[in-house]
Amino acid sequence: MRMSTTTEIIAHHWAFAVFLIGAVGLCGLMLLGAYFLGGRAQARAKNVPYESGIDSVGSARMRLSAKFYLVAMFFVIFDVEALYLYAWSISIRESGWIGFIEAVIFILVLLAGLFYLVRIGALDWTPTRSNRRVSKPSTVRYASSHPQDISQELSVAGSQQANESR
């Protein structure tokens, strides 16, 4: 006797359906428990950040550079790609040359993306150059710490000033 297709589908997927119902039910139970059992304090200090018993000073909003966000995104992207390469390396015997060629193309696309990121400066952490021109440094003579050299430099400087004043 052959089972109908709906019975086969139910028999095949019942465990996954029970898992989904259990996960959604557990999330709902935790949310309802927090709603009914949670405190309801409505004071002025409720919306003030708590800092280890110390009154906070200044703004709690700290500006982060977008570079940190970019690095996090690059990490996630390249980490997922490493996961794909790991899965490919496990099934390399079954995939054969076609799988190898696909992996090489995948790696080349990764390298092209990395090259593009380097080219646009997304991975460059040095500050950008300003367009200001730096003036040519003037010649400054530094006196040495030896007393004999200091007296010689003073006498040379004094004679130069005397010559300029004439």
UniProtKB/Swiss-Prot annotation:
Domain of life: Bacteria
Main subcellular localisation: membrane
Gene Ontology terms for molecular function: NADH dehydrogenase (ubiquinone) activity; NADH:ubiquinone reductase (non-electrogenic) activity; quinone binding
Pfam families, per the entry: Oxidored_q4
Gene Ontology cellular-component terms listed: NADH dehydrogenase complex; plasma membrane
Similarity remark: Belongs to the complex I subunit 3 family.
Physiological role: NDH-1 shuttles electrons from NADH, via FMN and iron-sulfur (Fe-S) centers, to quinones in the respiratory chain. The immediate electron acceptor for the enzyme in this species is believed to be ubiquinone. Couples the redox reaction to proton translocation (for every two electrons transferred, four hydrogen ions are translocated across the cytoplasmic membrane), and thus conserves the redox energy in a proton gradient.
HAMAP family with a match to the protein in the record: NDH1_NuoA
Name of the protein this chain belongs to: NADH-quinone oxidoreductase subunit A
